[in-house]
Amino acid sequence: VADLGIVGENEFKERNEDAEIVDRLGFSKCRLSLAIPKESKYEGVKWFNGKKIATSYPGILRKFLDKNNVKADIHVITGSVEISPGIGLADGIFDIVSSGSTLVSNNLKEVEVVMKSEALLIRNKQMDEDKMKTLQELLFRFDAVRSAQDKKYVMMNAPKSNIREIVEVLPGIKSPTI
């Protein structure tokens, strides 16, 4: 069993893993959405009543449909979910959407965003104290990288007599390193 992992939030929620979310990593962002043929008239989630929906995420979809009192048939498909309506396997789909270009190329339109997702750092709930200490050091480094993303590092050769003027033009976060 692994102590740490990086996983998409969508996979984490679908599999209902017994792990703890340690950090939201801010990359691999996408959304899980319902989509239907672009020529279909859509007036809300009740459109899916009695319809067939293809997905690789039946657990998340079932919770959403139940919450909205929608009775639909869920067809579990792994890979190329977006072709299902075009070949008559489903009336709509529930899948990952990033830019939406795959939906457009399959004559689909996004009609409901059910959940947003990004990469997560997760941990085994039974990590020992030494590993937790190492994890805290890793998180410190992650935070340092994130806080430095919009900052610039400037190095120069200048006479010490000009330090005051240089600091006025290029102040550091706390102070310059000399």
Predicted regions and their residues:
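Extracytoplasmic small-molecule ligand-binding "clamshell" domains
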Residues: 1-4
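Small-molecule-sensing regulatory modules
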Residues: 6-28, 38-178
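Active-site-proximal cofactor/substrate-binding loop regions of enzyme domains
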Residues: 33
